[in-house]
């Protein structure tokens, strides 16, 4: 029997390995409480990933721990051990989570990645999405709930049917037969983006055609106002006030939006586009969606074009071209002046978000250049744009 621990933010994970029975329960208790005392103020979670067996003596140790930790949780519990907890009533007293099946991405085809994870083809019928954060379970559960909501609302989306362990983190499994991402379509034919753009915009329009109830998803206007309030002290006073006033003047809309709409997040199956990443669902005026799209294709990689290559696998020039084609398709016009006018409105949202992000990461080597660029562009755009609506 071994007892080890690790700390992640405010959580103290105590791992118990092997068998805990009458012969070593006292020793296990001594080690567990010593770790707890040495790390005060932490929420205790028992990690049973390698716990093979627990007897009544071991259960009494958990009862004593629970008296001091009313919110005690036990995770990664094997089937046989879970049966013991269930039969003895512990599942009614303590939050106990079963162990998830283990999968590996070794040898799997890489499809795409986003801010929070990466997507792989596990086999001909299965897509595996991995999450970068070790404590991604709440995020995964929220994304599954968002996917369910979107599906009920009529959006063609892939709903994960299983949670798995991938290394030290988690993943979700989705059945997607013969599917490829819009990113792959672009990489395969960067000289003709028409097919990829049609899938991309058809899906976007289907999302924006849906109205949701207040409180069903976050309101993006409120989020954007928070961005403006954060960056305003770093701008000339008149610019900071105008930025907030422009966002404040955007009328409330209950239009459903994706919130992170880029080509890695759309798959094509049997000639139909479908979404695979749903953790950023929100609502509001489409200018907020277009702002995030501008960042995804141009803003985030404006000062370093290799960012586009690393994220999508196609060039920054291709991303710029795709943004232009997609915007025209979304607006339903080839008029350059109309499209530029709307693009500038979206850019104000995009640069505001990027400026906040860079200001919050002052120690990153790229931040000073990003801050300077965002300020420069916001000054230019705020002198030209008098409304964000279109």
Identify what each model region corresponds to.
Residues 277-281:
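Activation of the activation-loop gatekeeper triad in protein kinase-fold domains
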Residues 337, 352-390:
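ATP/Mg2+ or Mg2+-diphosphate-binding catalytic cores
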Residues 290-334, 348-364:
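Active-site activation/catalytic loop segments of kinase-like enzymes and analogous catalytic loops
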Residues 22-94:
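Amphipathic alpha-helical interaction surfaces in cytosolic regulatory modules
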Residues 209-259, 263, 269:
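An alpha-helical support segment within catalytic cores of ATP-dependent transferases
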Residues 109-215, 251:
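ATP-binding pocket architecture of kinase catalytic cores
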Residues 100-106:
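Juxta-kinase regulatory segment immediately upstream of eukaryotic protein kinase catalytic domains
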